[in-house]
From Swiss-Prot:
It comes from the Bacteria. It catalyses: L-glutamyl-tRNA(Gln) + L-glutamine + ATP + H2O = L-glutaminyl-tRNA(Gln) + L-glutamate + ADP + phosphate + H(+). It comes from Chlorobium limicola (strain DSM 245 / NBRC 103803 / 6330). Belongs to the amidase family. GatA subfamily. GO terms for cellular component: glutamyl-tRNA(Gln) amidotransferase complex. Pfam families: Amidase. This is Glutamyl-tRNA(Gln) amidotransferase subunit A.
């Protein structure tokens, strides 16, 4: 059985027209049929079936079903599940097992979600195509010669291919939203601090945020509401109360909605069909009573440069812990301590991770700190001011999720700067920490998905998802 929304599935489960065990077995069978696509790194066959049987027993005995009762979910392999592997798609963590659950995982499990396995990703969440993985590339479910996006490409492909009803990813600069756009699904990055990062392997700590990938806005918001909230294990998690997202979404009306459309998002380098599809969808909302407001965000050209200075600096610090001494991969060429450190990291990390560590170390060095890192922090503050000012005048900022549709596997691997541009529209929301979502709005002439990207003010996830629901391609 494969249903398009969790509410449909829940209705079938609660009425006992179908069992959790049957649902889970169906998903596991499909996962097995797609095993050559590298979508999952680890599949929890026994654990998922055992959990499903417990849920069936709970229901038969009159127990109260949780809010996610029987929802089959996938978890990106940089999020901790106790006793399961935690590879981050890297050789350096190939044999490591988590010793605790991430807070997000604990909260989902407490509401009766069923975890099917851990999904493939770009190594340490560094990439936009899911090609930077020690476990191989993941194909796009719509065209297996093309990428699913990254770094949460495995999670996006799992949902799009019907191998999970929803999935968790992590989003540092677009790693949930960009693959969602490439895979014709919804990808939500909440406000920084809305979801605890406890149990998420750090890439860039002031940017990282756990996000949700789902087939529709209702499912994504439901999962968000369960994970959101203060966590004593994460000092950066917000104390703000978690609202009723369903009620907030229902309150959103198209008539009178002010949609900010930055002129910088629709430049000559934007793929023609992507621009046409996004504009057409915006015009549909205008015809229903929304107001399209032209806005300008002149600093947009500096987003990618500032972002890659800041995140590589944080990555060079965060990844220093992987040295072969405490856990993970240790080189056999370890004649002394220094050789162990150098060879373990050289052999354990992939090309893109090493590139970013070196770049981060460079921008933090004494001679270049003020020139690069300090200046990028100043640019970040300017971005925060500009986006706050813009969102005082409009309800939401809208544009394409990516400047181009899914590209061919291998097409951009030798040109990192071109690869980085895949995130040019998603990076600003990460720089400022505001909530953002990619919602599917159409298909181009080659039947490749096109997503629209929306940004709202801090902690306005309900409003954001309500607007997205009006845009979502049926």
């Amino acid at each position: 059985m494969q249903l398009s929304s969790y509410q449909d599935l829940r209705s079938e489960l609660i009425s006992r027209r179908i069992t959790c065990e049957k649902v889970v077995l169906d998903y596991l069978e499909r996962i097995d049929r797609h095993r050559d696509d590298n979508i999952y790194i680890t599949v929890f066959h026994e654990q998922a079936v055992e959990k499903a049987r417990k849920l069936d027993k709970k229901l038969s005995e009159g127990g109260l079903p949780g809010k996610l009762f029987g929802m089959p979910m996938a978890i990106k392999d940089n999020i901790s599940i106790k006793g399961a592997g935690l590879t981050c798609a890297s050789r350096i963590l190939e044999n490591y097992e988590s010793v605790y659950d991430a807070t997000a995982v604990q909260r989902l499990e407490a509401e009766d979600a069923v975890f099917l396995g851990k999904t493939n990703m770009d190594e340490f969440a560094m990439g936009s195509s899911n090609e930077n993985s020690a476990f191989g590339a993941v194909p796009n479910p719509f065209d297996k010669t093309r990428v699913p996006g990254g770094s949460s490409g495995g999670s996006a492909a799992a949902v799009a291919a019907g191998l999970a009803l929803a999935a968790l990813g992590s989003d540092t600069g677009g790693s949930v939203r960009q693959p969602a756009g490439f895979c014709d699904i919804v990808g939500l990055k909440p406000t920084y601090g809305r979801i605890s990062r406890y149990g998420l392997v750090a890439f860039a700590s002031s940017f990282d945020q756990i996000g949700v990938l789902a087939r529709n806005c209702d499912d994504a918001s439901l999962v968000l509401g369960i994970m959101a909230g203060k966590d004593e294990h994460d000092a950066t998690s917000s104390h703000r109360d978690v609202p009723d997202y369903a009620a907030d979404m229902a309150a959103v009306r198209v008539e009178g909605l002010k949609i900010g459309v930055p002129k910088e998002y629709f430049h000559e380098s934007l793929n023609r069909e992507v621009g046409e599809i996004v504009r057409a969808k915006l015009h549909e909302l205008r015809d229903k009573g929304a107001e399209l407001v032209d806005i300008t965000l002149p600093e947009s050209d500096y987003a990618i440069a500032a972002y890659y200075i800041l995140v590589t600096a944080e990555a060079s610090s965060n990844l220093a812990r992987f040295d072969g001494a405490r856990y993970g991969y240790r080189s056999s060429r370890a004649e002394d301590v220094l050789a162990m450190y150098v060879n373990s990291r050289t052999e354990g990390f992939g090309k893109e991770v090493k590139r970013r560590i070196m770049l981060g170390t460079y921008v933090l060095s004494a001679g270049y700190y003020d020139t690069y890192y300090k200046k990028a922090q100043q640019v970040r503050r300017v971005f925060q001011d500009r986006y706050r000012e813009a969102l005082e005048k409009v309800d939401v900022i809208a544009g394409p999720t990516s400047p181009f549709p899914p590209f061919s596997i291998g097409e951009k691997m030798d040109d990192p700067l071109e690869m980085y541009l895949a995130d040019v529209f998603t990076v600003p929301a990460s720089i400022v920490g505001m909530p953002a979502v990619s919602v599917p709005v159409g298909m181009d002439s080659r039947n490749l998905p096109v997503g629209m990207h929306l940004i709202c003010d801090f902690f306005e996830e309900g409003k954001l998802m309500g607007i997205a629901r009006h845009l979502q391609r049926r």
